[in-house]
A protein has these predicted regions:
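A structural motif corresponding to the C-terminal end of an alpha-helix
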Residues: 29-30, 108-113
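N-terminal pre-catalytic "stem/leader" segment of glycosyltransferase-like enzymes
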Residues: 1-62, 135-148
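A short, active-site helix/loop in glycosyltransferases that binds the activated sugar's phosphate group
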Residues: 76-77, 99, 111-136, 143-146
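Extended catalytic core of nucleotide-activated donor transferases of GT-like folds
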Residues: 41-110
Length: 148
């Protein structure tokens, strides 16, 4: 199985470090056949990566489960017609407070995109904003994303 993550920037953020660790471990344990990280921008990142990192223009060649980590990335990812199972990872810390456009985007996410919350606090915030539920990840692992 192929698992990819789409992030805005390759950088040393808490979320990115978790993603790097998840993909590295999944490859070592043979939980996935291929791991990919797609990005829009590159920043300094000293983390070891045992998976491919590609500019977002290469998303058109990807097939598998794609986890999108920011609302601003969904429009591009949603236009891809390959065999992609799209998952949006909602993390309260990535939302811009007071951004009405982002809130409307959150409410109108396509019903074909599965939404998962990073933690319980994010799940409560997602429900408060949208009136919809977004299950919490039991653990941040490849198996959790692949079984969606």
């Amino acid at each position: 199985m192929r698992l990819g993550f789409y992030v805005d920037k390759v950088a040393e953020t808490e979320l990115n470090k978790s993603i790097y660790e998840l993909l590295n471990n999944a490859i070592i344990k043979n939980e996935i056949s291929d791991g990919c990280l797609f990005y829009n921008e590159v920043d300094f990142c000293s983390s070891k990566k045992m998976f491919g990192t590609f500019n977002s223009t290469d998303l058109w060649f990807f097939s598998g489960t794609l986890v999108v980590t920011a609302l601003s990335l969904l429009p591009l990812a949603s236009n891809i017609v390959n065999k992609i199972k799209m998952v949006f990872l909602y993390d309260k810390s990535t939302m811009q407070k007071g951004n009405v456009g982002e809130l409307l985007d959150l409410i109108s996410i396509n019903k074909n995109i599965k939404i998962l919350s990073r933690d319980e606090e994010s799940e409560k915030e997602f429900f408060r904003l949208t009136g919809k539920t977004a299950p919490v990840l039991n653990e941040f692992s490849a198996a959790q994303f692949l079984k969606v």
